[in-house]
Amino acid sequence: MAKQQTGLINRSYIATFLLFLVVLLPPCTKGKEGPSASVPTDCQQFLDKYFDAWKSKDIATLQALSFYLSPQDQSRFPAGSLELWRASKNNLVTENVEHVTRDFGDFKGYEVLRAKTTTISPQDQVAANTIGSGIHTELVCKARFSKKHDAHVGLHLIKETEGSQYIVAAWNFQAAP
């Protein structure tokens, strides 16, 4: 009979422990996206500058940091149309900042969730002609805003050479799941 009681006592301890794991631990980890991804120092500096511009609503800086156009693409523009492209790009940046601010509120901060860097050489003509040669970094950041507290920001950054500066080639915002 003593062995039966010990078995029952052990089972109740095990059941209590499993109940603790199943019921109490999931709420403790809910909402965690995992640790921040690491990015190269120059990429982190770019992100800080980019998101500081969002925080201060510095449209001119955001315009300067946005929309990559390769030298090959620039050379294909007819005379005078490159300035039209820049004006159109700058208007789009302004509209996007206004739209995101209206929908999400003021920017509060960010963290990098995922980052992937790929180098595309000029010799890889298909890729280089499609998205440009250089160092491409794709990021997903979790941004915090005043209205809808979290949004995921997808950024595709490019820099033409190791020593050049990053620029935003493409981006999108969406409410975090």
Where do the PLM segments sit?
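N-terminal secretory signal peptides that target proteins for export/translocation
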Residues: M1-I9
